[in-house]
Regions:
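A residue-level detector for the "anchor" residue at the start of short, highly conserved motifs
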Residues: 1-164
């Protein structure tokens, strides 16, 4: 979402499930996928107010993130979040800083429209640090992850990637 200065300071609301984000002159990132348990709202600059089910209201300041689970209606606020990690996609890269392979592969799966299967469940929690350009082909990314020793091997079958 662009800064409000680009829109003459006009405030607006973003509705997501039972969450309402009131934009009060700001730039923020909302990560809300249907198949994810949690919704993440990260403030880059300005200020936002998040209302949950018209009951609880949370004000967010820059470098803060709200993690909300709509199933349990639990909410937590994280301070001093590395905002670049959350918005790097806007700059054509995925920035994986200490993320578990399971989470990384979920992002890769969405971007390249493939199903990812882990044959060895132990590697799902293996942490990876790296930056991957979004315009790279999937084969190059898989080769790099293999060369870093994160996975032993992989196999591609049409729209499925099997990690070994």
């Amino acid at each position: 979402v662009s800064p409000s200065s680009d829109n003459e300071g006009a405030k607006f609301q973003v509705h997501n499930q039972s969450q309402v984000i009131e934009v009060l002159g700001t730039e923020f990132n909302l990560k809300a996928y249907n198949n994810d348990d949690n919704v993440f709202t990260t403030l880059v600059e300005g200020k936002i107010a998040i209302n949950l089910n018209n009951s609880e209201k949370v004000d967010l300041l820059p470098d803060q993130q709200v993690e909300w689970n709509p199933n349990t209606n639990t909410l937590s606020v994280k301070k001093d979040v590395n905002v670049y990690n959350e918005i790097s996609w806007k700059y054509g890269v995925f920035n994986f800083n200490g993320k578990p392979l399971k989470e990384i592969m979920k992002t890769i799966s969405r971007w390249y429209d493939v199903e990812i299967i882990f044959l060895d469940k132990k590697i799902e929690e293996t942490e990876f640090v790296g930056v991957i350009r979004k315009n790279r082909n999937l084969e190059d990314i898989l080769i790099n992850i293999k060369n870093f020793g994160v996975i032993k091997d992989y196999e591609r079958k049409e729209k499925t990637v099997i990690l070994k």
